[in-house]
């Protein structure tokens, strides 16, 4: 089962630190900010009916695999730094963790949006996360410095980060309308 918690203080020299707090976040709370979570066996998912149904029902027609480590990713330090810049995408970001681990941080909306607090989601082998288009987020590895993920896309893959501020983008406005104003 996925573990998630609010980051109450970010004072660290290393974003790969867990930054644990005692404010855990449930799947229901993740859903309130638009994040969806699924669990599949990463070794047999291609034969899993529930995974295939999810993929087909949502139109995930393209996938590729990314391996993030010092040995596999050219310009590793610069890439990791760019992944950790707060950004959004115009499409959903769908990641299925095949091996390794890391953290997705998404903006908290529990009255803390204005204080720029984060929810940290620990991603491990078998976790499939869907981050909705328009959500501000960032990614970092954990101290193991390795993750391998299947990236799923609808149609032609587009992975263009739009760094904050991007509040006037249609996708951000749609996200705010659907998730943030619905709870205030």
UniProtKB/Swiss-Prot annotation:
The keyword Transmembrane helix does not apply. The lineage of its organism: Eukaryota, Metazoa, Chordata, Tunicata, Ascidiacea. GO terms for cellular component: cytoplasm; nucleus. It comes from Ciona intestinalis. Binds either 1 Fe or Ni cation per monomer. Iron-binding promotes an acireductone dioxygenase reaction producing 2-keto-4-methylthiobutyrate, while nickel-binding promotes an acireductone dioxygenase reaction producing 3-(methylsulfanyl)propanoate. Belongs to the acireductone dioxygenase (ARD) family. Fe(2+) binds at residues 87, 89, 93, 137. InterPro entries: ARD, ARD_euk, RmlC-like_jellyroll, RmlC_Cupin_sf. This is Acireductone dioxygenase.
């Amino acid at each position: 089962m996925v573990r998630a918690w609010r980051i109450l203080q970010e004072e660290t020299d290393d974003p790969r630190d867990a930054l644990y707090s005692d404010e855990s976040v449930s799947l229901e709370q993740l859903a309130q900010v638009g994040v969806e979570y699924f669990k599949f066996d990463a070794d047999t998912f291609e034969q899993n009916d529930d995974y295939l149904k999810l993929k087909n029902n949502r139109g995930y027609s393209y996938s590729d695999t990314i391996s993030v480590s010092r040995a596999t990713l050219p310009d590793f330090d610069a890439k990791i730094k760019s992944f950790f810049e707060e950004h959004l995408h115009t499409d959903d970001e769908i990641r299925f963790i095949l091996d390794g681990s890391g953290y997705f941080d998404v903006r908290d909306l529990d009255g803390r949006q204005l204080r720029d607090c984060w929810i940290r989601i620990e991603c491990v082998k078998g976790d499939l996360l869907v981050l909705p288009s328009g959500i501000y987020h960032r990614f970092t590895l954990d101290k193991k410095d390795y993750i391998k993920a299947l990236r799923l896309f609808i149609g032609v893959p587009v992975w263009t980060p739009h760094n904050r501020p991007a509040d006037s983008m249609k996708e951000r406005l749609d996200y705010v309308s659907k998730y943030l104003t619905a709870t205030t």
